[in-house]
């Protein structure tokens, strides 16, 4: 009898906190590969999002929404700081009043991608002058390490050096230390996340899922927007009917990775 009462109470107790779809983009360009989204496609995705009525958050507000918020929210993130963010993505976002976080590999700013797995030909990144202008216009910037390093291959001292060097460069260039982080390739270890947590409020990975109150704030899942090039799937997701599609994409990704 007692077990039945406890079960009933648990079933009727509301789950605290809201949910956040943290969208993941890289480059907005007419180029092949999963890290590029065509400009017209990006504009369609953002227009649909802006019309959806879903709450839009800055990354600063994500932890609070997950802990005590209500309902669905979305945060928009970009990895790597490609120049097309300034030229293509930001004008669209600004026109729709949508906030964005851009994670910068600080050694690569003013240059082009030069890391393992980089696109060929290499895509240019923004300049520090562009970063400063965008920061003044309301774009948020986070830490993507100094050299776009795979943290899973580094020891703890190297992780600390990579993250701190990026923090110091951003402090020097744009006047503040970043408090949000994204490990390159989405890879980090438990020990690396402990180092990251010392100076960053959040860290995002590449697990394909919606962030919830139970999510690790230093390994938050994201929604890879390459999977929503088909606007039918994107509209269904925004309408709250996308769980099965997201689940299918996770299974396909897991199967593909198991053969690598």
Language model features with spans:
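C-terminal active-site subregion of NodB/CE4 polysaccharide deacetylases
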Residues: 1-77, 83-86, 153-260
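Alpha-helical scaffolding within the catalytic cores
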Residues: 5-11, 86-88, 116-136
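Acidic (Asp/Glu)-rich catalytic clusters
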Residues: 14-17, 50-51, 91-98, 124-143, ...
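Histidine-centered catalytic micro-motifs
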Residues: 23-27, 140-148
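A short, flexible beta-alpha/helix-coil linker loop
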Residues: 28-31, 108, 147-150
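Generic enzyme active-site microenvironment
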Residues: 77-78, 142
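A short, conserved beta-to-alpha structural element at the edge of catalytic cores
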Residues: 97-118
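Surface-exposed cleft-lining segments at the edges of enzyme active sites
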Residues: 111-122, 148-156
């Amino acid at each position: 009898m007692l077990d039945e009462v406890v079960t009933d109470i648990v079933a009727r107790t509301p789950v605290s906190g809201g949910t956040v779809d943290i969208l993941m983009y890289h480059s907005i360009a007419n180029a092949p590969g999963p890290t590029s989204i065509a400009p017209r496609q990006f504009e369609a995705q953002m227009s649909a999002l802006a019309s959806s009525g879903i709450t839009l958050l800055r990354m600063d507000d994500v932890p609070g929404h997950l802990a005590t918020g209500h309902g669905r929210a979305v945060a928009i993130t970009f990895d790597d700081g490609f120049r097309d963010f300034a030229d293509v993505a930001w004008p669209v976002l600004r026109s729709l009043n949508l906030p964005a976080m851009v994670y910068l590999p600080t050694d690569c700013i003013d240059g082009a991608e030069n890391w393992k797995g980089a696109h060929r030909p290499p895509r240019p990144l923004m300049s520090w002058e562009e970063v400063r202008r965008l920061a003044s216009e309301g774009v948020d910037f986070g830490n993507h390490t100094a050299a776009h390093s795979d943290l899973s291959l580094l020891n703890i001292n190297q992780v600390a050096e990579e993250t701190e060097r990026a923090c110091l460069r951003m402090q020097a260039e744009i006047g503040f230390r970043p408090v949000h982080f994204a490990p390159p390739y989405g890879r980090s270890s438990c020990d690396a996340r402990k180092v990251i947590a010392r100076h960053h409020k959040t860290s995002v990975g590449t697990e394909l899922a919606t962030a919830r109150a139970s999510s690790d704030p230093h390994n938050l899942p994201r929604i890879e927007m390459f999977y929503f090039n088909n606007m039918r799937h994107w509209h269904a997701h925004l309408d709250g009917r996308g769980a099965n599609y997201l689940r299918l994409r996770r299974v396909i990704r897991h199967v593909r990775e198991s053969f690598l």
